[in-house]
Curated annotation (Swiss-Prot):
CDD domains: Transaldolase_FSA. Transaldolase is important for the balance of metabolites in the pentose-phosphate pathway. One of its GO terms (molecular function) is transaldolase activity. GO terms for cellular component: cytoplasm. Belongs to the transaldolase family. Type 3B subfamily. The active site is at 83 (schiff-base intermediate with substrate). Gene3D superfamilies: Aldolase class I. It comes from the Bacteria. The keyword Iron-sulfur does not apply. It is found in: Cytoplasm. The gene is tal. This is Probable transaldolase. It catalyses: D-sedoheptulose 7-phosphate + D-glyceraldehyde 3-phosphate = D-erythrose 4-phosphate + beta-D-fructose 6-phosphate. Pathway: Carbohydrate degradation; pentose phosphate pathway; D-glyceraldehyde 3-phosphate and beta-D-fructose 6-phosphate from D-ribose 5-phosphate and D-xylulose 5-phosphate (non-oxidative stage): step 2/3.
Length: 213
């Protein structure tokens, strides 16, 4: 499974990029706003660090405006993927953009039915939200599994990006469910490399080594 980082913080991306594990990155208007910088500036810098798909989201809510915004964003870098919300106007925009060769990532997916519609419209990626489904008592991982099964049956090339990842177990679960990609927050990536038994083991090795000196 591919690993994307879900952040607009360049310092976080720089740190994780040194691990050599990043296949891409996702941003959204909330993450960009948190950084207090212009979208174009942030996205350009991310593209210079991560060699893979970088999702940048439109903020318009009607098809024509989305398409115009998407075309401008796509000019920033060859790795830009246009993030578009799952709604009727968004699906119309995805259809237009796919015919122009502009890659899209349909976000705010909460059901396999939505994922199927987005894929049929020409989306390069779909982003089902795992954590937010869990928040309302539904099973976000099961949704990923259903989407993966449907895409496999019908040989749909759209890639699944498991989003709204809250903890390391989510990453494990979506990998087992067949997601092509997980977009993971910085905090969760840092948690993934840690384990209390690893820390105990390192301490024991050092203790034994120092005793032998």
């Amino acid at each position: 499974m591919k690993i994307f980082i879900d952040t607009a913080n360049v310092e976080e991306i720089k740190r994780i990029s040194k691990w050599g594990i990043l296949d891409g990155a996702t941003t959204n208007p909330s993450l960009i706003a948190k950084e207090g910088r212009q979208l174009k500036e942030v996205v350009e810098e991310i593209c210079s660090i991560v060699d893979g798909p970088i999702s940048a989201e439109v903020i318009s809510l009607n098809c024509d405006a989305m398409v115009k915004e998407a075309r401008d964003l796509a000019k920033i870098h060859k790795n830009i993927v246009i993030k578009i919300p799952m709604c009727e106007e968004g699906i119309k925009a995805v259809n237009i953009l796919s015919k122009e060769g502009i890659r899209t990532n349909v976000t705010l997916i909460f059901s396999p039915q939505q994922a199927l519609i987005a894929a049929k419209a020409g989306a390069s990626f779909v982003s089902p939200f795992v954590g937010r489904l869990d928040d309302i008592g539904m099973d976000g991982v099961s949704s990923i599994k259903d989407i993966a099964e449907i895409f496999k049956i019908y040989d749909i090339k759209t890639e699944i990006i498991a989003a709204s990842i809250r903890h390391p177990m989510h990453v494990l679960e979506v990998a087992k469910a067949g997601s092509h990609i997980a977009t993971v927050p910085y905090k969760v990536l840092m948690q993934m490399i840690k384990h209390p038994l690893t820390d105990i083991g390192i301490e024991k090795f050092l203790e034994d080594y120092n005793k032998s000196k």
